[in-house]
Amino acid sequence: MALALFAEIHVRDFQAAKPWYVQFLGESAFAAHDTEEVWELAENRSIAVEEQPENAGHSAVTVFVDDLDTWVDGIVARGIEPTKRETYDNGVRKVTFHDPDGNEIGFGGPPL
């Protein structure tokens, strides 16, 4: 069975939020319309950012990657610092970022 993931993050003002997401994830894969763009993280695995003011700030997405340090180092190099770093009892690590609307985007990785 093939699996595709399309997670959506809601923001108050897409045009105001877009520069942060470009800095965070790079250029988007495509614009769905004037107030929504899609970032493809891997084949069939995407994050969409859409203007929905009534739901802004309530999204939480965690993406598990094999190369957590590489992902986080790239984001930090582009000028965005994580808001939290955690290591769970089983060694799994999670690094959390928050966009200007308060949405949580986390990256998890395997134990070192």
Each model region followed by its residue ranges:
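Short hydrophobic/aromatic beta-strand element in the GNAT-like acyltransferase core
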Residues: 38, 46, 62, 82, ...
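Vicinal oxygen chelate
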Residues: 78-112
